[in-house]
Amino acid sequence: MRFNSFAFTLAVTFCLGLVLFTPGCASKAPAFGQKGYTENGKASYYSDKLRGNKMANGQRYRPGKRTAAHKKLPFGTKVKVTNPVNGKSVKVRITDRGPFVAGRIIDLSKSAARKLDMQRAGVVPVQMKVIKPAKND
């Protein structure tokens, strides 16, 4: 069997072209605030004493609504918050700013906290995932 250097060079060039000009297989993480964006940290929930107080979006806090506070996500963003300890999750709308305690990523309304079964603990580890970005009005 005779070695053909032209065929070898052509095959190597073809393979190198595939590697260089084919998009990578690694997926890019969703951008901040976009569908699929996730954060891991701790969640806490609002006290009943805050009932009726104005939130950062101008609305009044109502413990029965499934709302939440996040430091930077736009108001109106819908997120799914999951408690990995028990597997329970809840969908909430961002309506306020906070929490401003290190390690905490989201403050939940009482109704949302109840859904995650976190009322007794007060603060629990969670994963938060954007399921619907805020509308740009």
Regions found by a protein language model. Give the residues of each.
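Secreted/periplasmic proteins
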Residues: R2-V12, L18-D137
